[in-house]
Each structure stands twice: as structure tokens, then as C-alpha cells.
Amino acid sequence: AIIEMLVPPNSGPVPHKHTQFQECFYVLEGEVEMQTREGKQTAKQGDLVHIPLDGPVHCFKNNASQNARLLCIVAPSGLDTFFEEVGRKIPAGTVPESVPPTPEQIAFANQTAEKYGQKLYPKDYFDK
């Protein structure tokens, strides 16, 4: 699956791990800070980041003041279906308001992630 991601400033996913697919991020616009236990790396426009099958716990964040746009490529597919199940649809070409998830939304995402071979970790996972 190929997923276009629009990442607003100061946002990104919580640390997570995929056990059933590999993932690549290609930065189309802007930049994101990728993080694993090994450290942080800034991925800029034109950069490609690969997370292998059953790779490390990872996350990314857009620390810039403008949106970042990424292509997320996963094989085999499944992450796209996860996003359809836990996300909300927005009109094409619009930027969703960045609103923190409710405890109920977090619980639903954690439960649903397991069904798709993912494990989500607390946002402070790398601070420990």
C-alpha cells in the first residue's frame, strides 16, 4: 500500500512497532525527525527511511512550522486498513485540525493496532 501522509507541525504518531510488514517513508515536502532507541535522524525532502519487517520501535515528528508531506509505503498492505478503521475522513486537499485524542480513542487505536500486527507505545516511550 502507498499512503500519502500530511503531517501538521508538532505532530506525528506515538512510538510503535510493526510485526507483519515493512515500511518506508519518502519525504515529499518538509522534514520529520525519525526516532528509534538508536537515536534521532532528520529526514528531509527527497530522503527515504526504511523500517524493516519486525524492525525497531520508531516514531516521527514534524518539528517545523509548516506541514510535512510523506509517502508511506508498506508491504504487505494493512496499515491503510488500520488508518481507515481508526481515523476520520477529511476532504482531499484539506489539513485536519490537530486535536489530542481522547482516552477512548487511544484505547480503540491500541486495541485495533494489535489486529493489524502493530503495537503502540506511550508517547514518552523513548524518555525512559
Short names for language-model regions:
Residues L53-D80:
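Ligand-binding loop in jelly-roll beta-barrel domains
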